[in-house]
């Protein structure tokens, strides 16, 4: 967040409702440029690029205003001869500027809310993705029913802009934003297809992530308001921290905002044991009560999306299942609640009784098939999971090749170390290890056996399997029972702030 202090101090002297002048500030695009370079680990920063200069931005905006909207076609190629430049690259420049500017007022609100609530220190401790799973382990073992919900996309990007207008009132800024979206995302279509939204999100990830997260934040605000109104467990206040985006904390005044829409008595059933978890575009709703109440919440979700956000969702896409019989996918894991049955013999005087005890345990498993599919897509193995060489890396040195494979293996091992069964994780390590050996053999134009015999690389490649043990041995003796127990059990690393590309839900 430190990189935003430069323009945040300048923005504080202005009213937050007027963001249009900030679009024409040089330092905004300097920050956008540095943000793009900092996200890349394969390219060195060569300094400030002239393509991110304010002069080019002004020229692009002027051309947008002068462009005749009627001659824009939905099938415009990325390089339009009328424009005379690459629209994809220019779209990225302006969208980064839009994203930085529109984040300013919400980041200021987040800072003020954190200071008022005096939770600045605790805020740093709740950023981990893996903090969700200890919550699931504590709560879900007492619940019976779960609903796996995919949050629907809006049919048009105008819906996302309209939601944002409720919070930022700056007509010139939104006029320019609409003009930008019209040119770069085929807004002349009546309905924006999911494919075009996906294309726009890949070309302009930061702006789309902001707009989409704001839409999700608004939907969650109403949902939590309804949940507070229907539950015995009233929440005094709550905060919505959107992943990897520095947004704001919402408070109890949302009751006043939506009171006019829900002024009549709500026919709710009391459900004090409902739990809601979301990451990206997927959410899990679980409850202890009968399926009838879960079905009622399902229809509330559907009507909420249709009436307030004009988003259509089919009721059959939301299924209600028993936790003991259904696995749900979240954050790259398959999770379900297993019933462990044990029989205890109890004796009272001369009578003996057999007592059956049923305990529940949240079982979190590595999804081996999706992971192998992702590795096959990245050319580390075939679709059956057989390791193959990666010739595109053969130009690098042996050390760089091994380091690349080890980095991927460390990331996956670090992320999936909380799984209850490690066999699938060991198989992924095995695939990466053999793929690394085959890549080195391909580089040296040799067979795998001849390469290993000549170079003696077995000891070096043992790092694929021994790294976790070496880390734990710094804390526990290598021959201790504690080390063996910790190595076999799940360990949640709470410093993980993002999901690896290979474990995305999509």
Swiss-Prot record:
Its annotated function is as follows: Usually encoded in the trnK tRNA gene intron. Probably assists in splicing its own and other chloroplast group II introns.
Subcellular localization: Plastid, Chloroplast
UniProt name for this protein: Maturase K
A molecular function annotated in GO for this UniProt entry is: RNA binding
The entry assigns this protein to a family as follows: Belongs to the intron maturase 2 family. MatK subfamily.
Q: Name one GO biological process term.
A: RNA splicing
Q: Which organism is it from?
A: Trifolium striatum (Knotted clover)
What are the GO cellular component annotations? chloroplast
The record, for InterPro entries, names: Domain_X, Maturase_MatK, Maturase_MatK_N
Cite the entry's keywords alphabetically.
Chloroplast, mRNA processing, Plastid, RNA-binding, tRNA processing
């Amino acid at each position: 967040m430190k990189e935003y202090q430069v323009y945040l101090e300048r923005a504080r002297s202005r009213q937050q409702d007027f963001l249009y002048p900030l679009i024409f500030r040089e330092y905004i695009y300097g920050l956008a440029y540095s943000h793009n370079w900092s996200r890349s680990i394969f390219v060195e920063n060569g300094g400030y690029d002239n393509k991110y200069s304010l002069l080019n931005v002004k020229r692009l905006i002027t051309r947008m205003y002068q462009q005749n909207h009627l001659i824009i076609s939905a099938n415009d190629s990325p390089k339009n001869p009328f424009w005379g430049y690459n629209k994809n690259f220019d779209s990225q420049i302006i969208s980064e500027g839009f994203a930085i500017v529109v984040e300013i007022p919400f980041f200021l609100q987040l800072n003020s809310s954190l200071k008022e609530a005096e939770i600045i220190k605790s805020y740093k401790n709740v950023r981990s993705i893996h903090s969700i799973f200890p919550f699931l382990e504590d709560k879900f073992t007492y619940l019976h029913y779960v609903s796996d919900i995919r949050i629907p996309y809006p049919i048009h990007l105008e819906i996302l802009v309209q939601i944002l207008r409720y919070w930022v009132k700056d007509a010139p800024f939104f006029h320019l934003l609409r003009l930008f979206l019209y040119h770069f995302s085929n807004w002349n279509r009546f309905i924006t297809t999911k494919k075009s939204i996906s294309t726009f999100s890949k070309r302009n990830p930061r702006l789309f992530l902001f707009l989409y997260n704001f839409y999700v934040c608004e939907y969650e605000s109403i949902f939590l308001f309804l949940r507070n109104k229907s539950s015995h467990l009233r929440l005094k206040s709550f905060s919505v921290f959107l992943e990897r985006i520095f947004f704001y904390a919402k408070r109890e005044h949302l009751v006043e905002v939506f009171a006019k829409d829900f002024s009549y008595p709500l026919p709710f059933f009391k459900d004090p044991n409902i739990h809601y978890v979301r990451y990206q575009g997927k959410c899990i709703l679980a409850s202890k009560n009968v399926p009838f109440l879960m079905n009622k919440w399902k229809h509330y979700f559907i009507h909420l999306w249709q009436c307030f956000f004009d988003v259509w969702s089919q009721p059959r896409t939301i299924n209600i299942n028993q936790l003991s019989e259904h696995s749900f996918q979240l954050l790259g894991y398959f999770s379900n609640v297993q019933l462990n049955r044990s029989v205890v013999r109890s004796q009272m005087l001369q009578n003996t009784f057999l007592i059956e005890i049923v305990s529940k345990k949240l079982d979190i498993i590595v999804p081996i098939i999706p992971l192998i599919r992702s590795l096959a897509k990245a050319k580390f193995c075939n679709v059956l999971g057989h390791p193959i060489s990666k010739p595109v890396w053969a130009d690098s040195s042996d050390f760089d090749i091994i380091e690349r494979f080890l980095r991927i293996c460390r990331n996956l091992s670090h992320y999936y170390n909380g799984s209850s069964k490690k066999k699938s994780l060991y198989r992924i390590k095995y695939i990466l290890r053999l793929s690394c050996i085959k890549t080195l053999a391909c580089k040296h134009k040799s067979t795998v056996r001849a390469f290993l015999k000549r170079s003696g690389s077995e000891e070096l490649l043992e790092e694929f399997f021994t790294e976790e043990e070496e880390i734990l041995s710094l804390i526990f003796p290598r021959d201790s029972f504690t080390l063996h127990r910790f190595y076999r059990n799940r360990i949640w690393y709470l410093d993980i702030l993002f999901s690896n590309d290979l474990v995305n839900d999509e």
